[in-house]
Design a protein with these regions (language model features):
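Hydrophobic micro-packing sites on short alpha-helices
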Residues: 30, 59-67, 74-75
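A short, Lys/Arg-rich alpha-helix, primarily the initiator
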Residues: 1-22
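Residue-level recognition of specific faces of alpha-helices
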Residues: 44-47, 73, 87
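DNA major-groove recognition helix of helix-turn-helix
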Residues: 34, 49, 59, 75-78
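Short, basic-rich loop-to-helix N-cap that marks the start of a DNA-contacting helix
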Residues: 24, 42-43, 50-65, 81
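Short alpha-helical DNA-recognition segment
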Residues: 23-47
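Interfacial/linker helices and their anchor residues that mediate assembly or domain coupling
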Residues: 79-107
C-alpha cells in the first residue's frame, strides 16, 4: 500500500529517509545494520521509504536504534513535534529534566 498524505506508512517513509540520509547511510547499510539479510536489505529499505511496505513495530524499533532516533520519531505526524522528540532524545539528561520541568510548570 503506497503511503501518501497522512498515512502512518507515509509518515514512516519520510522520517526513515530523513534520518538515514542525515547519518549518510545507504539503504543497504541501514538494512544490514538493522538485521536484514544483505541480499534483501537495500530492496526492503527502499520499499519502506517508498511506502510500498511499512515496517512492523519490531523492525521499526531496530531501525530507530540504528538511526539513533526514538521510535516515536518514525510515527510522528507533525514535523514540529518530530523535531521536538528528536531534540529531547539527543539532549543531555540534565537539559531533558529542565525542559520537562519548564513544560510541566506551564501546564
Amino acid at each position: 500500500m503506497a503511503g501518501t498524505g497522512n498515512s502512518t506508512a507515509g509518515i514512516q517513509q519520510k522520517r526513515l529517509k530523513e534520518a538515514r540520509l542525515q547519518l549518510g547511510l545507504s539503504q543497504k547499510q541501514l538494512g544490514i545494520a538493522a538485521g536484514l539479510d544483505e541480499f534483501v536489505a537495500s530492496t526492503r529499505i527502499n520499499r519502506y521509504e517508498l511506502g510500498i511496505h511499512a515496517p512492523d513495530y519490531p523492525m521499526a524499533t531496530r531501525l530507530a536504534v540504528v538511526l539513533n532516533v526514538p521510535v516515536a520519531f518514525l510515527y510522528c505526524d507533525s514535523d514540529e513535534m518530530a523535531q521536538m522528540i528528536l531534540a529531547f532524545h539527543r539532549a543531555p539528561k540534565t537539559r531533558r529534566r529542565q525542559a520537562m520541568a519548564a513544560l510541566q510548570s506551564q501546564g
